[in-house]
Amino acid sequence: WKLAPALAAGDTVVIKPASDTPLSILELAKLLKDILPAGVVNVLPGSGRVAGQAILEHPGFAKLAFTGSTEVGRNVGLAAAKRIIPATLELGGKSANIIFDDCNFDKALEGAQMGILFNQGQVCCAGSRILVQDTIYDKFIAALKKEFEAVKVGRPWEEGVQVGALVDERQLKKVLSYVDIGKEEGATVITGGRRLTEDGLDKGCFMAPTLLGDVTPDMRVAQEEIFGPVAVVIKFYTEEEALAIANEIGRASW
């Protein structure tokens, strides 16, 4: 969605895909090859340290746009500031889904499930914090547990699969480590919290959809982006309290 408005404005674009997942952008470039003039959309695969740094230092760019970690995003922002050009940075999120007791229960369940499990939770705007009003907390969590456990995890091309693999082994280990961190902080695993290895999934980085309960807003699992199929559930009592919890983290603008 960053490409389309740039092209509509008459700009040329250089895209550096993520080092671990370059193929989709390369396939897109193949499709665009027969549609756009040469040089309008350019793909530069490679590591961030080499290809990414070359982009930051090249004088031919009038704007920088980055999606990724805060650490790298800081470098992108500094590079843009040095050259006095604009930069847009998407550096993660901890979006709050607020479930009130007068909600459309089924729609809220669907939204909470899809909000965190879409793309295995590897989305900047994943609904990773689920705030539930106290009067329906137990009922909602019980129903959401069933929803999570009904989700089919597997190879994306297989029928009925909703959740695929995480991007790599390193990311899977990071996400699982957050489950351990949550338990150490006092959270409970309502469902999931483990790697999936059955039915041939041992050859990939698959994880069971995970819900953590008994979470308080000050816990790391409620403060830090996990970037995986893990949602934390936080109980609230009043609208004012829910808004305060949601707004405490600046990464909630989604």
Regions found by a protein language model. Give the residues of each.
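ALDH superfamily catalytic-core signature
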Residues: 36, 71-216, 238-245
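Short, solvent-exposed loop/beta-turn-alpha elements that line the ligand-binding surface or hinge
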Residues: 222
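Glycine-rich nucleotide-phosphate-binding loops and adjacent flexible coil segments
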Residues: 229
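Conserved small/polar residues in nucleotide/adenosyl-binding loops
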Residues: 252-254
